[in-house]
Amino acid sequence: MKRVLLCVLLTAAACLAQSSTSSTVIIQNVTVIDATGAPAKPHQTVIVSEGKIEAIDSSGGGFGGKLSGTQVDGTGKFLIPGLWDMHVHMVFGDWFPHGKEITLPLFVANGITGVRDMGGELEVLQQWRKEIAAGTLIGPRIVMSGPMLDGPKPRFPSSIAVKTPEDGRRAVDDLKRRGADFIKLQSLIPRDALFAIA
């Protein structure tokens, strides 16, 4: 039951933060786990303003006066830093047809606030990233490679074939121009092309 309540708390906070980035959310009496190895800190008040944690204090006593904003009761619940899934493929041909409608909100509901897409359709992912930033789509922060680079006979249809050093440099330049955050390489790239890419 506590897991369900935590998911509801995280989803509610994410929805509130995305629906109006100028709003303030105050989570009171929550147990904070900061993931540094320090013991859990019970009875904390966390203030989130414009999508960022502004302050954490025990019982809100250090804030002085009445706190204004959307109040969330964290009694019996835990608050942790957002998690990252460092290897996902959200748009990969027709393998994951419901990524936008199902997968993105499920990431957030399960505490995943950031993902690294390791090979997918760059333009689709960029559109999702814009919608998430605008608050019209619930989902995690996305960093993406776009199509993977592979050797002369790629294993996946969406991969970019690299035969020569020139192919490699051209592919990297093109992905950079199109907005890729990083480049993912597969294992079939010829040695000379690999060094040109590096």
Predicted regions and their residues:
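Short helix-capping segments at alpha-helix termini
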Residues: F63-G64, I132-P140
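Divalent metal-dependent hydrolysis catalytic cores, especially in the metallo-beta-lactamase
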Residues: T103-E123, P140-P147, K176-L188, A198
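Active-site gating/metal-coordination segments in enzymes
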Residues: G151-A198
